[in-house]
Amino acid sequence: MVLETLNPLHYNITSLVPDTMPVATVPILILMCFLFLIWNHEETSSIPGPGYCMGIGPLISHGRFLWMGVGNACNYYNKTYGDFVRVWISGEETFIISKSSSVSHVMKHWHYVSRFGSKLGLQCIGMYENGIIFNNNPAHWKEIRPFFTKALSGPGLVRMIAICVESTTEHLDRLQEVTTELGNINALNLMRRIMLDTSNKLFLGVPLDENAIVLKIQNYFDAWQALLLKPDIFFKISWLCKKYKDAVKDLKGAMEILIEQKRQKLSTVEKLDEHMDFASQLIFAQNRGDLTAENVNQCVLEMMIAAPDTLSVTLFFMLILIAEHPTVEEEMMREIETVVGDRDIQSDDMPNLKIVENFIYESMRYQPVVDLIMRKALQDDVIDGYPVKKGTNIILNIGRMHKLEFFPKPNEFSLENFEKNVPSRYFQPFGFGPRSCVGKFIAMVMMKAILVTLLRRCRVQTMKGRGLNNIQKNNDLSMHPIERQPLLEMVFTPRRNANENQGDGMDQH
């Protein structure tokens, strides 16, 4: 009887469906369930990070890099998801890492020596499979690197000390060239001029227009930073990338002229030994057929922009920190007077300037300029338990790493952070391993020589309310102050113990 009662209900159930759910809704529900399953599948990734979300996730993450800049985006993702994060750039899986053990693993292994970036962007700036900085062809990079290694070490490293002293002194004597209408010093421009001059004297050795080349380098860097991660469609819209292409062409053209001057000079000198610098070695390698003219031009360009691009900003930030921390300045000056005295700094002084060295390290930790390293996995791997597929992009967020582990006062500027020996895995401003910064040793020599020479001559001061935290910065490919702001100006005052001929160039300031 019960079954008989239920049977009519069974037979008539379909007649009730239209009243409660339209038939057209059923396929939509099925599709939604299918998409929900896909969504859930993507969310089960063992690596923290934003979800794939039917392809929306990769678009959003790439868009965030373009909108915020590489450095800011990396900090956002690490802060939000942890020290090992999966995102996407140009649809490619990308890991952002700020954990010291993972960072060390990547740096020390050869299968992470390749770089990544937009092929069209790198082609536009001349770095695609060329030069050394972003050359993503490991075989060709290995052929090019020895030219840089030779120029940046050995006799060249020792010569650079005297060159830095000479250049710093000359530029301090010509401070009027970087003095504003209010009588203040454009310290960043001063550092850029010194860096370009020292690079030219050691690596190229031809007359050049400092001011013009510095401006061309700034524009080239802006193009490099803007184009590195742009999607391919950007390059199909000519008016969008015209100004960047023009900036690249401008610097390349200037460098080609300077290199041609070098060729002419080499063809007329009697003793080649006296003129065998970095550019000469490249030119002769081209003559032997080992390099192309394009290789030579790009390598010289990269050698000439490296210091004005990064070291100049690093030194500028250091001058601001010195002005903000007078007790640190006093410690440094006491050491300089003890170690160097009244003479110019020499190579033997370098290892004895411990306080100056700790100041440089702490400045680079607290206010880094290059705070990330970009690599690509050339084979499958596992990093701290996370699977890494061949072709995965890797961004090492070393700037964040330097403020998360080991240091007693990670969020403060304090020389106490380097009072004790710091294990290398916790502090890597230049990286290490097969693709570490090729100029890391000469960079330390240059910074010491320039700081000592400058501080012996004058005291540096910031304008009231214009400290490091007040300066607007752009954290993209590297950390740079936003140009054309009065906060970049400083006051240089001659020291009392400077002799008269040293002080003349700065009396008006």
Swiss-Prot record:
Keyword Oxidoreductase in annotation: yes
InterPro entries: Cyt_P450, Cyt_P450_CS, Cyt_P450_E_grp-I, Cyt_P450_sf, Cytochrome_P450_Monoox
Principal subcellular localization: membrane
Listed cofactors: heme
Domain of life, source organism: Eukaryota
GO MF terms held by the record: aromatase activity; heme binding; iron ion binding
Membrane topology: Peripheral membrane protein
Keyword Membrane among UniProt keywords: yes
Alphabetical UniProt keywords: Heme, Iron, Lipid metabolism, Membrane, Metal-binding, Monooxygenase, Oxidoreductase
UniProt subcellular location: Membrane
GO BP annotations, alphabetical order: brain development; cellular response to estradiol stimulus; estrogen biosynthetic process; female gonad development; memory; negative regulation of testosterone secretion; positive regulation of cell population proliferation; positive regulation of estradiol secretion
Alphabetized SUPFAM superfamilies for the sequence: Cytochrome P450
Reactions mediated catalytically: testosterone + 3 reduced [NADPH--hemoprotein reductase] + 3 O2 = 17beta-estradiol + formate + 3 oxidized [NADPH--hemoprotein reductase] + 4 H2O + 4 H(+); androst-4-ene-3,17-dione + 3 reduced [NADPH--hemoprotein reductase] + 3 O2 = estrone + formate + 3 oxidized [NADPH--hemoprotein reductase] + 4 H2O + 4 H(+)
An annotated GO cellular component: endoplasmic reticulum
Broad EC category: oxidoreductase
Positions annotated to bind heme: C437
Gene3D superfamilies for this protein: Cytochrome P450 (1.10.630.10)
The enzyme's E.C. designation: 1.14.14.14
Protein task: Catalyzes the formation of aromatic C18 estrogens from C19 androgens.
Family label: Belongs to the cytochrome P450 family.
Protein's name according to its UniProt entry: Aromatase
Organism: Taeniopygia guttata (Zebra finch)
The organism's taxonomic lineage, starting at the top: Eukaryota, Metazoa, Chordata, Craniata, Vertebrata
